[in-house]
Amino acid sequence: MRKILMICAALAFLTNGTAAFAQDAVVKKIIEIGKTDNQVMHQIDILTNRFGGRPIGSDAFENAAEWMVREYKSWGLDVKLEEAGSIPVGFNRGPWFGRLIGENSMPLHFVTPSYTSGTKGVQRGHVLIEPRTDEEFAQMKGRLKGAWVLISGTSRGFPIDHSAAGDSLRSKIKEENREILKKNEEIWAHNRKTGEHKEYLKLKEQPGLYYREMCEAGVLGFIQSAPVPLRALYDRRLVENPNTTFDNIPEVPDIKLDEHQFAIIKQMVEERRTFELEFDIRNHFKLGPIKYHNVIASIKGSKYPDEYVIVSGHLDAYDVATGGIDCGTGIGPMMEAARMLMKAGAKPKRTILFVAFAGEEFGQLGAQAWVKTHSDKLGKISNMFNRDGGPEPPVGMYVPKAMYDDFVKITAPVKQIRPDYPFEIRIREPRKRPTEYGGTDASVFAVEGVPTLGFVTDDIKGYDFDYDEIWHTERDLYTKNIPEYQEHTATVTAIVALGVANLDKQLSREGLYIE
């Protein structure tokens, strides 16, 4: 019996030793691939330059999703498109042009939010400043037809609120301005009688205060001042309204113009100079509803197939640019990590899921759908590695004390990739479990108590990257990527995801949240 036990123990030792040796060989192979055959920038190139900006409901989003499926299949992963929801109409953005004709002639630098109207071909017209009172509207109503109208405020990327709630707010402000005018008449009479110089009350402003009336009068479009770099989001009211159909879409363009050009044009209008603006904006809609899907690829676990490690990013991106950073920095390294793992012959003990979420920019829609559909899996997720930030490389992690030893062991090979790139595991204190969604897909999982420990990143080479410059702006381009950072990120992601998947036990959640 003793001899049999010794033989069994020896076999177990050999088996475990062989498995450990095999995994070490896989990690070395991943590092080699990362150095000699790293294709992360190819993935980002296709995603951002061949497909471009890709909001849900667009052809670009659907085409990018199909491309991801094709790539994953070619690498040997299991992959599927999983329906996550639908949107009432679709939207495809074409090119846009504009110019000032006359004195101070110049090309115009502008954007329009997604899901807003384009022009009816090339349209040219004079320019007016929007009215603030009934009297001002009456004075100019005969000139509104065929005019471009400058509206108040500074753009935050959204169009004028054309909803019933927006109409209600505008009606309220109009009434308040009527009362202000009455009080100003009293102030005028008082000043005239007494010789005092009591200041008049300021009228309240609201972008597009006479929006409905101006649309009915036949304006060509609205123009609002916007800080540079220009930011353009989407028509949230249209997308979220269940009553939206192809037949009730707003038909007047909503233009966000470079603040410096806006100031010049506004001054020219105030000085009553003669000039025109010309725009050609090719924004196109699709009949809906349009379904959108999460792209889910997987490497099935060899020992714990019903336990999971998630690597994720979001596939959708605003189309004012091409989503080179937001979220090319998530999708590119995720795809390349999957390719590296397959090419290196990885056979993880746990299933690794590679998830490209839909609709993050419209409110984490794909992540919410995944959590709802797969609620039974939430307790079996070791960690979610979600990347949705800049191109900076991983330089460490903050983890609960109960995970510290595991992550120190898992990440030990990371320092072999590039000695000039630091990587350190540090202990973090328990935090309150979030109760509301934040700005990323990871927040949806965190609310459910799932570990969403991400990498600490840093611009260690000092390449002067500024996330705010690209965040939902015209500069979110492929060229804003830093190739060496992205290549390192893909390699680190592959190694760490595999390491977590190969632990003998699921990562402890002790000390993760204060319950």
Where do the model's predicted regions map?
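Bacterial N-terminal signal peptides
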Residues: 8-16
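N-terminal hydrophobic or amphipathic helices/low-complexity stretches enriched
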Residues: 20-63, 70, 78, 299-303, ...
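Second-shell loop/turn segments in exported
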Residues: 27-35, 49-59, 96, 125-131, ...
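Noncatalytic luminal/extracellular "stalk/propeptide" segments of secretory-pathway proteins
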Residues: 45, 49, 53-186
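His/Asp/Glu-rich mid-to-C-terminal helical/loop segments that flank catalytic regions of hydrolases
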Residues: 246-249, 253-256, 264, 339, ...
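Zn-dependent metallopeptidase/amidohydrolase metal-coordination segment
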Residues: 206, 433-489
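Metal-dependent peptidase/peptidase-like ectodomains
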Residues: 103-107, 145-146, 156-157, 252-254, ...
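Soluble metallo-hydrolase cores and metallopeptidase-like ectodomains found primarily
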Residues: 24-26, 107-109, 113-139, 240-324, ...
